[in-house]
Amino acid sequence: GLLPFAQMRVRASELLTTPLPAHRILLVENERCLHQLPQPTAQPLPSTIAVLGAGLNLGWLAAPWLQERTVAYWGDLDTWGLHMLAIARGHVPHLHALLMNAATFSAHQHLAVAEPVHAPDTVAGTWTPKEEALALRLRAQDKGRLEQEFLPAEAVHSALRAWADED
């Protein structure tokens, strides 16, 4: 592996100042999704490090070293996940959203639940037109929240492999 540890806990302030030794950085909103990521020994994603559990603590994405990396963001498919995606993309404009699209929501809509409170209006100009349309769709749904930890691992692995292969 790239690091001598399978897992480690790092402060956001450290991520701001210390470049991670990987070409690809995967940002995952929720650390409960660790079980869905490919195991390094079975299905490695070369030169990839996942940072899990930052939630709304996204200020570290202003780190200059991230501009030189291939970066993806995977969050809940709800207004809060899209809100965090917008904030993240405000720091890293070239960031790629994974599994945060209408096709993913439609394919797994049976797993969706009601979102008790919608996120505030988001950072203007950071969503793609399709993401903006998705946000409107999710707000209009009775069950407009698809939490990432309930997506099938196969769907996650497929999306990650496609992202890695683009690079």
Regions found by a protein language model. Name each.
Residues G1-R69, W80, A86-A97, A103-D167:
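Nucleic-acid enzyme cleavage-core boundary/entry regions
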Residues D76:
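Catalytic palm subdomain of template-directed nucleic-acid polymerases
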